[in-house]
């Protein structure tokens, strides 16, 4: 009897100890800074033509080459080149700091849920690579924890290839370090995007399945090495332009201070991007995705992108006027009265107000308002695909869960803890309302 009691007490103490250990492994957060996008930088310099030509060339590239990436991720080839066809970074604006090596070398990166590799400029890039020379560069000779790998790799963007090679070192983020983490030292960076970029490199947070050379992403290494408590991370972006706080990423959990329950979860439909089924896009009626479609939650762009014809329907609905090469402008005076555009996900309606989907930028000392919706024509075989960037994620707290292969969205809070209205609500179509009214009339 006494032996049984002792065994029971021992088991209870063991369980209690496990709980204490779990509590001691705290959540890790990365503070994000919000910077002007390259779009805004070019516009402020009066270079709209340069910006538009660059964006037009990117979309033309998508139309021509958009099928490569979607053929069962065939881009994981011998040469280690992958087509990051949805990557642009012209509109990226949320950046955070990581360190690599011992002693630490600091870099500003985009935490990008639309790609899976970490790359930063290399000290070994040639002097004529302007993009590389204008940013912080990793020096392997200065790090005592550096390990050589040497595999060559390239990532094809709309403006050319980022080329480099794989190295290993300690990569630290949010106060924890991924030891012997493979990453790419970039020796060639393409186009104006990376020359004028406010960031040094990219830290991909999508699934390992789309990583160049099968390199394990940083977050997955952190979880594997037991540096974070749970196999998920979450994004809170602050859309207030007057706030110094750009946002936060929580590694290994969810920050209850940043959102209002409940979280609406939808399953990942394909392990690669954070891809899920979206029910439809609605305004006064259905504007797009009428029969359901695939969508991607993407922190690497600030825009919302979709099939060109459906995006044009949205532009017409909100009263946007064509500007140049696919760009649309809205009168800034009309922003407060613009109609909401809603995205139905998991049966819930997530609405964006005019102030959410309009981007205000300065050009020649004047403020102009641009639509945050962009049309992209992908090959027919790819199917209907939408990209929900920071215009959406900035409005809704977003959870990326590897363990349960799901994405979650919830009503976000402001930096001072106030809920950002409106809250998500169950979707009820016009047909539902008409049906109810018809039933009421029949009862009478």
Swiss-Prot record:
InterPro entries: Aspartic_peptidase_A1 (IPR001461), Aspartic_peptidase_AS (IPR001969), PEPTIDASE_A1 (IPR033121), Peptidase_aspartic_dom_sf (IPR021109). Residues 1-17 form the signal peptide. It is an enzyme of class 3 (hydrolase). The keyword Signal applies. Highly expressed in intestine and to a lower extent in body wall muscles, hypodermis and neurons. One of its GO terms (biological process) is programmed necrotic cell death. Residues 413-444 are annotated as: Disordered. One of its GO terms (molecular function) is aspartic-type endopeptidase activity. Residues 94-410 form the Peptidase A1 domain. It comes from the Eukaryota. Glycans are attached at residues 106, 433. The active site is at 112, 298. SUPFAM superfamilies: Acid proteases. It is found in: Cytoplasm; Lysosome; Secreted. One of its GO terms (cellular component) is lysosome. Disruption phenotype: RNAi-mediated knockdown prevents muscle degeneration caused by bacterium A.dhakensis-mediated infection. RNAi-mediated knockdown prevents neuronal degeneration in a mec-4(u231), deg-1(u38) or gsa-1(Q227L) gain-of-function mutant background. Residues 433-444 have a biased composition (Acidic residues). Belongs to the peptidase A1 family. Aspartic protease, which is part of the necrosis cell death pathway. Involved in neuronal cell degeneration. Involved in heat stress response. This is Aspartic protease 4. It comes from Caenorhabditis elegans. The lineage of its organism: Eukaryota, Metazoa, Ecdysozoa, Nematoda, Chromadorea.
